[in-house]
């Protein structure tokens, strides 16, 4: 709301309940072809948003902000990098894997509802420009400082410089807490152990939430396709 007021733009707020999100978990995992926990969590609100756009507007092209964290090392755990070499190495690894995680989420959620996605931060020229930045400038107590400085004056100062929130966290902790409780109720200890056993050591579920997503994925795509996801984030 604050950004919309600052820019004098007409924004539509779309809300959903955790229960509505849970009722669409099958649809989300079917669209994603993934069982990665972070991806499923973040995809559910985006899937519902794209559904709303399709049903209630004439928009067919949507802009989304994926890519800047991978390109500029914006994830909070990047603060733990012991040196610039480790920072850059993880930076490049995340960029190479984006098609399995955030890129997959954005593409599949939009595509599931017949929408075309435009991702400016993944434009080749932008990526190439970011790769020419002195890597030491990317390592900063404030993540993505270079990008924040570029948008000075275009966003409210406190919004521009606040700490990053993950997408599934930013829509409200109530969503994550509720889906965790749902998984606890759906997956008992016996089922959990069976799912772990049938994973045959590949991306072994560590929580009941991970086991829930894995079981839903298996129902749709079978256990032979576990390898579609190289790791669980």
Task: Say what each PLM segment does.
Residues 15, 156-165:
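Conserved S-adenosyl-L-methionine
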Residues 1-155, 170-180, 195, 200-206, ...:
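ATP-dependent adenylate-handling active sites, centered on carboxylate activation for C-N bond formation
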Residues 180-192:
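Short glycine/proline-rich, acidic loop/turn segments that cap or connect secondary-structure elements
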């Amino acid at each position: 709301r604050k950004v919309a007021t600052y820019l004098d733009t007409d924004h539509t707020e779309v809300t959903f309940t955790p229960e509505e999100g849970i009722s669409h978990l099958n649809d989300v995992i079917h669209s994603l072809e993934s069982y990665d926990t972070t991806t499923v969590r973040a995809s559910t609100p985006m899937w519902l948003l794209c559904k709303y756009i399709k049903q209630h507007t004439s928009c067919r092209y949507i802009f989304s902000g994926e890519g800047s964290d991978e390109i500029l090392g914006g994830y909070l755990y990047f603060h733990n990098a012991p040196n610039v070499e480790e920072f850059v190495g993880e930076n490049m690894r995340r960029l190479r894997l984006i098609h399995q995680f955030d890129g997959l989420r954005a593409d599949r959620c939009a595509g599931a509802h017949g929408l075309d996605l435009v991702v400016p931060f993944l434009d080749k020229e932008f990526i190439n420009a970011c790769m020419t930045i002195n890597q030491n400038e990317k390592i900063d107590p404030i993540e993505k400082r270079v990008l924040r400085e570029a948008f000075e004056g275009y966003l409210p100062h406190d919004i521009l410089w606040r700490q990053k929130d993950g997408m599934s966290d930013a829509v409200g902790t109530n969503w994550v807490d509720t889906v965790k409780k749902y998984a606890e109720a759906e997956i008992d200890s016996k089922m959990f152990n069976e799912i772990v056993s049938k994973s045959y050591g590949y991306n072994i579920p560590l929580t009941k939430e991970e086991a829930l997503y894995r079981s839903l994925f298996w129902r749709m795509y079978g256990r032979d396709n576990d390898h579609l996801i190289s790791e669980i984030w």
